[in-house]
């Protein structure tokens, strides 16, 4: 897999990230083997959140790390906090408590990156700044990012925190293409023209913030997978034809479509299937032409003015 710098930082990681939201039912030995398979495929970054499996995902990963002391230095781990039962919490106390819990479950003494999982409209920016200062000074967190933040939320946060925000996780896929559609359909009355994220794609490029695309195979908001879904015959026909020409799968083409964008995004995949993991990682070696990229985009039902 190709490696890339995250934001303007010294953190270098694979352009495909393994999301760990679904590992809670794996055994420690199964997860250990799976991590090895991911590393063999070229993946060096693993994505967690304190709510995944109600903490069990981090606990299992931590058991693997504890049984293999030299593994930690070979990989990058990021995790997220802010989502609680029925509300969001970016208070200083919750951020600090969350990180301590994350580190305890992962059985490590640092995170390569902490991301604020969802924007908390009640957050006191001075508190977030103090929490970041403590975490950075103590060595518990090396880099910081956000998730699902719009441009002005990042701008406001960055006005208070000293540490650069180097990543922003956003839902993005062929069928959930708001990030690009509002720009493509600018100055029209098309349904996709209204911008819902503060032009976050352009903002992140200007500020050298890496967008980490989550749910690359989903349509809607957790409505399901579009790959081989009979609801979407046209996009699957185009994906299938291009996949056959390139000698890879439809899923690999769907990821390659995201990686083709010059914003230099990372893609977070959440599979726990070894064969599918290796298959998707072939995306790193696929180069879509401009014509192919737009053909896939149009096949997904997105209009060009």
Regions inferred by a protein language model and the residue ranges of each:
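Hydrophobic faces of well-ordered beta-strands that scaffold small-molecule active sites
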Residues: 14-18, 46-48, 75-79, 114-116, ...
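Short, acidic/polar
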Residues: 26-38, 90-106, 152-155
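Active-site groove signature of glycoside hydrolases
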Residues: 103-124
């Amino acid at each position: 897999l190709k490696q890339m710098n995250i934001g303007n930082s010294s953190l270098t990681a694979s352009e495909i990230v393994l999301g760990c939201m679904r590992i809670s039912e794996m055994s420690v030995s199964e997860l250990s083997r799976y991590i090895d398979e991911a590393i063999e495929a070229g993946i060096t970054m693993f994505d967690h959140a304190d709510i995944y499996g109600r903490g069990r995902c981090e606990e299992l990963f931590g058991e693997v790390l504890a049984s293999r002391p030299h593994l930690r230095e070979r990989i990058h781990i990021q995790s997220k906090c802010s989502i609680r039962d029925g509300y969001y919490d970016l208070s200083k106390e919750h951020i600090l408590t969350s990180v301590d819990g994350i580190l305890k479950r992962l059985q490590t003494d640092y995170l390569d990156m902490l991301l604020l999982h969802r924007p908390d409209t009640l957050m006191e920016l001075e508190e977030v700044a103090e929490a970041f200062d403590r975490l950075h000074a103590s060595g518990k967190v090396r880099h910081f990012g956000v998730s699902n933040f719009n441009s002005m939320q990042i701008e406001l946060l960055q006005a208070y925190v000293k540490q650069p925000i180097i990543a922003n996780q956003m839902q993005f896929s062929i069928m959930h293409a708001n990030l690009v559609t509002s720009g493509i359909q600018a100055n029209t009355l098309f349904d996709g023209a209204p911008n819902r994220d503060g032009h976050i794609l352009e903002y992140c490029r200007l500020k050298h913030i890496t967008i980490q695309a989550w749910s690359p195979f989903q349509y809607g908001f957790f409505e399901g997978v579009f790959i081989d879904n009979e609801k979407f015959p046209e996009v699957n026909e185009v994906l299938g034809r291009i996949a056959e020409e390139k000698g890879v799968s439809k899923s690999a083409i769907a990821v390659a479509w995201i990686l083709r964008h010059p914003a230099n995004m990372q893609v977070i995949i959440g599979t726990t299937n070894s064969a599918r993991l290796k298959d998707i990682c072939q995306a790193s070696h696929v180069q879509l032409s401009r014509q192919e990229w737009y053909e896939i985009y149009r096949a997904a039902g997105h209009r060009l003015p």
